[in-house]
Amino acid sequence: MSGEVSYYAGQTAEEAVARIYDRSGRPVAARRWRGVSGEIDLIAREGAEVIFIEVKKSTSHAAAAARLSRRQMDRIYGAASEFLAGEPRGQLTASRFDVALVDALGRVEIIENAFAA
């Protein structure tokens, strides 16, 4: 997949995942939020809890899951910490890390609380 095609496929996947969160009463507060440490695809809220969402797209859900590396998780943790610093409760804000897997047919599988800091 070329860089441009990959970029638009990723955007489409993120949009589909954002719709799922919005429809389930967990509004997306930020898209592609960028901090010094890295980028977070989507940030949603469920009451007072902040949900950091990493979206992975590939031919299958298993292939998408395999694309999430430890190094990438570390960057997400760093960016999440930066985001939480701006919250009223700071690092004490309830939060979780979800992973949304999107396959070639556009089917979405969400793994809530997929990894922890």
From Swiss-Prot:
An annotated Gene Ontology molecular function: nucleic acid binding
Gene3D superfamilies: 3.40.1350.10
Pfam families: UPF0102
Family of this protein: Belongs to the UPF0102 family.
Name the UniProt record assigns to this protein: UPF0102 protein RHOS4_03930
Species assigned in the record: Cereibacter sphaeroides (strain ATCC 17023 / DSM 158 / JCM 6121 / CCUG 31486 / LMG 2827 / NBRC 12203 / NCIMB 8253 / ATH 2.4.1.)
